[in-house]
Every structure is written in structure tokens, then in C-alpha cells.
Amino acid sequence: MKKSQKRISNVSEIKAQLKTVETKVHNGVFLFSGIMTIAELAQKINVSVNQIITYFFHQAKMYNLNHSLSEDEIAEICLEFGLDFKKEVQIDASNFMEEVSILDQDKDLSPRPPIITVMGHVDHGKTTLLDYIRKTNIAKNEKGGITQHTGAYQVVFQGHIINFIDTPGHEAFTQMRARGAKVTDIIVLVVAADDGVMPQTKEAINHAAAANVPIIVFVNKMDKPNKDVDRIKNELSALNIVTEEWGGSNIFVYGSALTGQGIDTLFSSILLLAEILELKANKNRYPIGTVIEAKLHHNKGTIATLMVQNGTLMVRDFIVAGYQYGRIRSLENTNGQPIKFAPPGTPVIVTGLNYVPEAGDKFFGFHEEKFAKQLALEKKQSEKISKTKVQTKQQTKEKTLNIIVKADVAGIAQALHSTIEKLASKQVHIHILHSGVGIVNKADILLAQTSNSIIYAFNLQIPAAIKAQAKQAQVEIREHTIIYKIVDEIKKQVRGMREIRYELQQIGTAKIIAKFWFSKVGSIAGCSVLSGKFVENCKIELWRNSKLIHSGKIESLQRDKNPVKEVQVGNEFGTHIYKFNDIEIGDELKAFLDVEIEE
């Protein structure tokens, strides 16, 4: 990038989208940003408070004017009173990294290098493959090799750059996804030709599916005499990873990480898929990307590896990552060589930050320190509020029980998987993210943390270190040795999660035949039951001349000055209506009870 060439500012993009949503009716559409009270909603849509309260009363919901309505309830009221509705996202410092859309014009976009993560079962050759690729790149680099672990590196194949994120495995991949980072474009799944699909292979596939990342399969160890390629294809097809040879959409590459067989084919396949994915970015803007890793060096201070995904990062740029900001002092490529700038699709080692960002933090680059500082400060101040909003939002989503199943033998794991899926109800969906054989491991904990899952471990000993990690990550591991106890436990969870629905059923009618006034209580209605019955604390409607006057509940129920629990047809009783005194002789009372509706 030329020094004189100006970059598009992220400041203008963000400022343009930072907004406070004005709650109002516009062209028959009610615009709102979140929950509000009945009184607030009534005022905004020009409907009386009583109309809204009565609407919810008929749904067995006893609300007052200060009750806060959920987004779904606001939508219900809008539809009830003939309005369309639209929720608009309010964007501020607490959520701008997630909500701000950076839209570049097509003419400004150009292809960027793909970003690859290699995953696979232990001992299937993931590390050997990465080592071979890394050494190949070092050999081509005349200025020397990589002297430190940077978390990411680049290779050049036929003039095209490919990025590899070098992580310890599924754990790091999941940690990034847990923090909302979408950094990987393609996953290369390594499967040993002489071993087949193993537990961590399934884990990797589940991780990829959860992150919606396409998979290229590298069938490794093709130099082994006991390889069985058909077995690999069959086992992977059962997991919805189907080779193109069989009409599927997954590219399979056959080779050996030890000898280098198939590596060039793998590179070609990556570039082909990257072309299909149309990975593009605008190099002429300030940078946006993800923190790959960071550490504190005793001499250099913070050293961080960043993946630039859009825009160009330069020395002296200010960046906001997490809820802090800093200024870039130096840039190095992953070979440790100084560079002047890092375009899109470039892993870069930076110094100058006065804090250590976390892996998976998204970062934005700016030329204005004032704006970066303001955003970081506001984001920090809103962190606790933001967490509360997330929890509230999660509670209002469709109810899903996420589960991970681990067992000592495959047959039990399969049986549990099948049995648990059948325990879902109409209101509560059960999603089994992963089921497998063997002890609960770090990858299980991280997947559970990411997806808010419960881990069920059948007939397994959980290592103390794993229990400690689960506790720290606030992940539940439930250990069992009897299947029906797992079933009973999940049934209780499903019952506890479902929204209890009630139907308001009319149980009786009465006529007010006398009224009295007591200064300590208010109006007392003397009533005669015309049909059905009245019960203690039942809900009522008061009607006068065929017009609904009041919806509420009775506060007491007495016969001959003695409190009673119910009064049957043909009998008389006295009652006081809660916080309501405007009664007249001849008024009709209708009694209602909430009845729970079974699914």
C-alpha cells in the first residue's frame, strides 16, 4: 500500500451507525428497540392502558401499568391493534463490534488470502502436517525461518498466499468461537488412513458445523500398508462429510504429512474452495480483524498476533480490542521480519499495546486516539450491563436444552443419544451437540462452555483436573451409572424449562344484590351466585348494562361474616373487589380461574 494513499476511516462508519432508536409509530409501523412498560407502550401507540391490561387479562396475565412487556408481548399488542412492528438494534459502545456493518462497495473489494485451521484426532498427523507445511515455507524463505510460535503463519503456493492458524487444537478454535470470533474460512480435517474416524474426529466435525465452516478432508498416512480409504469414506459419510466422488460436497485429499505426498493437491484444493467462497476485502480502509494470541514479554511488553481480515494495519494505528485500546509501535510478519503494513488476510505480530488482549477479541483500527479511547471507555463501563442484557435475551429465546453425551462404550453412547432426543417437547428442543466414547476432555468442556451445554457422563471417571476446569468454566458435568436416572433428570429439566401456559376459564356468574361501605375496606358487594361457583381469590369481570367496567380479582369471600373458600350456585356471599369501589346493585360478576394447559 502506498504511503500517500488514504484509508477509509472506520470512525465515520461507526459514528454513522451508532444510534438511539426513536420509539414511535411511523407509516403504520411501530419502531422500538427493546422492552417497555404498558404505560409507555400505550402512550406511544395511542391506546388506553386499560385496553392493554384487559388484553393480557384474557390471557390469564395480571399486569399493571408499570409492568415491563417483553419484545414478543409488544409485538402481540401491535398486531392486536392493527399495527405492524419492527425492532431496531440500538448500537452503542457496548455492542458496536458485533452490530456495526462495514459495507464496502464492490469496486473497492479484492480477493484476500484464505484463513485455514487444521483439526483432527490426536496421532492422526495434524502436527506433522503443519510442521511439513511450515518447513516447506521456511525453505522457500531466503531470509531465515520462524524463530518463535506466533499462532499463525503464511505459505505461498503458485503465487498465492494461504494462512494457517497454528493452534493447540480444538480447544483454541472453540475458545475463539466462544468469544464470537469468525476468523477461520476453511477447516482441514486430518484423518489417518489406517485408523479411521475417532472421537476427536467427530468433535472436530461438530465444531465445524457449529461454526458453519466448510471442511476439506486430508486423508493422511497413505504411505501405510494397512490403509483403508473406503472405510474412511463410509465412516465420514455417516457424519454428513461426503466426498465429491460419491456426489457429496466435501473435497478429499489423499497423502502423507511425513513424505509430503498430496500437500500440493491440498494447497490447490484450498485455493479452489477459497475462490468458490469469494473471500474479498477492502485494503483501503482502517483495519478490522481478530486477536489470535497475545503474551507479555519481559523486554518488549505486550506481543500480540493479529489476523487482519479487512482493511490495512499500519504502525501508529490505534486499535480497540476487548474494552481497551492501544497504539501499534511495530509490525512484523510471522517470520519475524519488520513490515510497514499488513493488508487483509495477513497475520501480523504487533508491539506497543499497553495491555494483553484475549485470543478471539475482535479489533478495530482508528487514526483518532480520542475516538478509540472513548469507545474503549464506554465499552468497559457497559460490560456488566451488556452481560445482563445477554442473559435476558437468552431467557426470551426459543427454549433449547443443549447436551453433550460421553459414555464408556459406543453402544451406550448411541442408546443415550437416541433416548434423550425423544425427550424433547413442543416447547423445549433438545440439541445433542456431541456424543462420543471416552473420558470427558478439555474439548468437551470448551464446547459446553461455548454452547451453554450440560455434559452427561455415563459410567466414566472424571479426572480432577477436568472437574476443576469445568468448575472454572461454569460447565455442569453430571455423572451417572444408570440410564433411567439420566432420563428422569432430563425429563425434569424439560418440564422446568417449558413455559407454563394457562387458559382462563369461566367458572360462575353472580349478581350484586346489595352494597355496603366500610371505611377500612371500601365497597362490599352482597352477591347471589346465579351459575357455577365463586372461589377465594378468583379473577372477575364486572359488567354493567352489557358493558365491561372492570377486570380484577376478589379480595375476600364471606358467608354469614365468616371467610369461606368457595360459594356454590344458589347461595349468597359478600366480597370486596381488590382496589375497586365503583359497584352498583344489579351489576353482574363473572368468575374466572387459571387452568394449566397440558402439551
Curated annotation (Swiss-Prot):
Give the residue ranges for region: G4: 220-223
Keyword check for Nucleotide-binding: yes
Segments of this protein annotated with the region G2? 145-149
Q: Which Pfam families match?
A: EF-G_D2, GTP_EFTU, IF-2, IF2_N
The segments labelled G5 in the record are 256-258
Q: Which InterPro entries match?
A: EF-G-like_DII, IF2_II, IF2_N, P-loop_NTPase, Small_GTP-bd, T_Tr_GTP-bd_dom, TF_IF2_bacterial-like, TIF_IF2
Q: Positions of the region G3?
A: 166-169
Q: What is this protein called?
A: Translation initiation factor IF-2
Originating organism: Mesomycoplasma hyopneumoniae (strain 7448) (Mycoplasma hyopneumoniae)
Question: What would be the name of the gene that encodes this protein?
Answer: infB
